[in-house]
Amino acid sequence: ALSKVFIDDLMQALSDLNRPEIRCIILRAPSGSKVFSAGHDIHELPSGGRDPLSYDDPLRQITRMIQKFPKPIISMVEGSVWGGAFEMIMSSDLIIAASTSTFSMTPVNLGVPYNLVGIHNLTRDAGFHIVKELIFTASPITAQRALAVGILNHVVEVEELEDFTLQMAHHISEKAPLAIAVIKEELRVLGEAHTMNSDEFERIQGMRRAVYDSEDYQEGMNAFLEKRKPNFVGH
């Protein structure tokens, strides 16, 4: 379950992996897992009178960190995904799942009033009608259905899952890391607001400026002209 201790450890691991030589991260459960994650640790939800999903809730913290993390994060899913864990993987950049995986949003089983940020994290990719069905029924959907409605990027057989995901991560890792980081941030900002305010625009422009002033940008141009594979170094 997504206990505070588990999420603290996960956030620390992500912080430790935020190094220039790391280009892509895979979020996964142990191989052979029947349950990818059971979602919130129910024992840690507060009693009546307190918001169970406040701004500082561990789930809110990890979803923000995943969304704002400067490197692509791939969720490699084997087993069933429940509740808050579904939102957590929806916050990642790509989701690759085994064909036997299932996905459930279960707050209404517990009477939990899911918050606006969490709903937004789901509707940004899945669409309102799909999210309504998932939440209103709390029924699991198959990986095949999740792929068909745009929740997943790929569905593969379980025995091929790790190799397929590693190949995807390796492919991403060969690209320009600074450009990927700024585009990920652009997509996050655009996904969170209907309009972009002037401060955000200037900040993004500054990030883009740092990319096209970088050695990697020049290396990419040179490699294209010279018809060779670029060697990106991250500065």
Language-model features: locations:
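A short acidic, glycine-rich active-site loop
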Residues: P46-R60, G206
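C-terminal long alpha-helix characteristic of the crotonase
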Residues: I96-S101, L152-E202, N231-H235
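CoA-thioester-processing core
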Residues: I62, I66, M76, W82-I135, ...
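Well-ordered beta-strand positions
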Residues: D93-L94, E133, T137-S139, R145, ...
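Helix-loop "lid/cap" segments that line or gate small-molecule binding pockets
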Residues: L134-I135, E186, L190-E192, G206-Y212
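Glycine-rich phosphate-binding loop at the start of an alpha helix
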Residues: G39, D56, R60, G83, ...
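A structural preference for short, pocket-lining loop segments at secondary-structure junctions
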Residues: V5-R50, M65-S75, L94, A98-T102, ...
